[in-house]
Amino acid sequence: MKYLSRNDLETIGGRVIAAYKRLPAISGQALERVDIDFLCQELLGLRIDYARLSLNGEKIGLTSSCDIGVEVFPKDPSSTEEQYYMLDGKTILIESDLMKEGANIGRRNYTVSHESCHHILKMLFPHDYGVQASGRSVHCCYRSNRGNGDWEEWQVETLAAMILLPPECVVRSMERFGLGTQMRLLNRVFAPADYKKFEAMASFMGASKTALSIRMTQLGLLKRNDLSDPYSLVRVDMDEEDRIL
């Protein structure tokens, strides 16, 4: 298997975005966001389809570079009928719930990017990529983070964010939404005005707030990220409080 560093993946992501920008429908535009469906279909020649991938909703995307059947589930939860979907090596299968009204579009877009990146790495490294996965031929994306114990999946997850949120797009979108060249604090309680701008920016870019905040931090465009815990700014740990007393 090919071992790629974060810098290697940034280089690959840059090459993919450069090729995307040369597509006739994109060429000449100042890129502010990536249409991940268009990139997937027009640049990579992949097809996106939808099905119910698991009974508990944990599995949200899958793909394969070969012909193989995968189990899918009926829309009616009471049905016991076995169903299979035949992947053709060029199809990305996304959980159908991600297309429902009110679903997290950022999660859906990231899943498309994630599954696309399996194909990108296979195209770039056909003799190295996928050969260490104990014969695995189907790649799955899960709703919850299962950790980075799988090096192959870490590379795909990292590249997926880089392609969905390339540096030039993030910088231009920050300018568009009045966040300047660097966001000092992301905190919905103590910096609500900037938080609303950030929220609008994430929606505009088709990304989840979590993915965008992590990407901005990686790029040095966000100094402090309190997205998951806005009160961490003022919280005093019990041990520290005991020392004071």
Kindly give the residue locations of the regions a language model identified.
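Active-site hotspot residues in diverse enzymes, especially metal/ion-binding acidic/histidine motifs
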Residues: 1-245
